[in-house]
Structure formats: structure tokens, C-alpha cells
């Protein structure tokens, strides 16, 4: 998964976010000028926002490129009353006017959703309007298609998480992982049960 990190600089934020829900938004705008840096600047400087920086955690462009917004462990600024323990995902486009989501954008969402599910476990997906006083993500946003997008399981060398717990993969190709043992990882001892989950 290629997530482009532009190294945005933020003001003070509450770093106690524990992602358990995804909330999707439309930007209500599109075009080359709507970069992640432009949104970040707008959220920091325009009077109706005045946030520490971009309120979203991820931004998906129409061309399928995915940009990092605020850190996952930072409480968002994207859905009043529902910013804690959520991740805000913004889609470029005005889905009140735009009638179809480009394949590139939808496919990027599927990749991002898979990445986040593999990192945090299964999380419900909501449109902004379902959790806040808003019409976002727009009348024509394919919310059910986005909500029900298939997730591809993936593994990485190192720590992985699924619905049962955390486990440590040592070989992705052969699916080797620690189990029924104590292991020293990054200077810390961890105990793994017979199924490979950290205790």
C-alpha cells in the first residue's frame, strides 16, 4: 500500500486516538489545486476551521493516490461529536454533483480499507451524515459500495493484528510466525500462545 506522506507540520493535538471506526467524507471540491497540503493549510488558517492541521487521517484523490493526513493516534477533526477513536477518510470530489466514483479512487479505497483492517482489525464504516449533522459524503456517494468493499487479508514481516489479537510474522511467503514460545523483540520479551497470539 503506497501512502504518500508529505511530512505535514501540526499544532498541538490529543494523541490518544484508538481507531475503532472509519468515517468517510467527500471533499465537496476537486481539481489539481486540492492537494493534501492545500487542505492542511485551509484547516489551519480559515476561521471556520482553525484546527491543528488537516482534520482527516487519510485523503484519497480521484486518480487513486492516497495521502496521509494527521497521525492515526491523533484525535481527528472531521466529525463533530465523533472524532475520538475514529479515522476520518476524505475522498476528493463533490458527490452531490459527481455521479460516479472513478475506479482508481474506489480501488485505492479497497487497498486502504484492507491496510487499516489488517492494522486495527474489522471496523464499521459510516458516512459523515450517519454520525454528524451533515449531508456529507454527498447524495451520489456510493456509500453502500464503499462500506461493503472487500478486504484483502495481508501480512507483513513483524507485528500483525486480526480479530483475535496480535501475532508476529517472521516469513510472509511461508506464513511462519512465533508460537508457543517466548521471544525477544526489539529488546522486550513477549510470550506467544500455541496459536501464535501474544499473551
Give the location of each predicted region.
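Short secondary-structure junctions
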Residues: 1-6, 47-49, 161
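Basic/polar, cationic surfaces and motifs that engage anionic cell-wall
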Residues: 1-27, 62-66, 71-72, 82-87, ...
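Active-site acidic/histidine clusters and adjacent loop/turn architecture
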Residues: 16-44
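Glycine-/small-residue-enriched capping loops at alpha/beta junctions
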Residues: 47-54, 62-63
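Short loop/turn microsegments at loop-to-beta-strand junctions
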Residues: 54-55, 187
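Glycine-rich phosphate/pyrophosphate-binding beta-alpha loops
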Residues: 75-77
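Extracellular adhesion/carbohydrate-binding repeat motifs centered on closely spaced tryptophans
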Residues: 153-199
Amino acid at each position: 500500500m503506497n501512502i504518500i506522506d508529505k511530512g505535514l507540520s501540526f499544532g498541538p493535538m490529543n494523541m490518544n486516538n484508538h481507531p475503532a471506526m472509519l468515517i468517510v467524507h467527500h471533499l465537496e471540491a476537486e481539481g489539481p489545486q486540492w492537494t493534501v497540503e492545500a487542505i492542511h493549510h485551509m484547516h489551519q488558517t480559515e476561521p471556520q476551521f482553525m484546527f491543528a492541521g488537516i482534520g482527516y487521517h487519510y485523503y484519497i484523490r480521484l486518480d487513486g493516490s492516497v495521502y496521509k493526513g494527521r497521525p492515526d493516534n491523533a484525535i481527528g477533526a472531521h466529525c463533530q461529536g465523533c472524532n475520538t477513536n475514529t479515522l476520518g477518510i476524505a475522498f476528493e470530489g463533490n458527490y452531490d454533483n459527481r455521479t460516479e466514483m472513478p475506479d482508481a479512487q474506489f480501488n485505492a479505497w479497497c487497498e486502504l480499507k484492507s491496510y487499516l483492517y489488517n492494522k486495527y482489525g474489522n471496523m464499521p464504516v459510516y458516512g459523515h451524515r450517519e454520525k454528524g449533522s451533515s449531508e456529507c459524503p454527498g447524495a451520489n456517494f456510493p456509500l453502500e459500495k464503499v462500506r461493503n468493499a472487500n478486504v484483502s487479508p495481508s501480512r507483513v514481516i513483524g507485528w500483525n493484528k486480526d480479530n483475535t489479537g496480535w501475532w508476529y510474522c517472521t516469513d510472509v511467503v511461508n506464513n511462519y510466525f512465533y508460537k508457543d514460545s517466548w521471544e525477544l523483540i526489539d529488546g522486550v520479551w513477549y510470550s506467544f500462545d500455541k496459536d501464535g497470539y501474544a499473551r
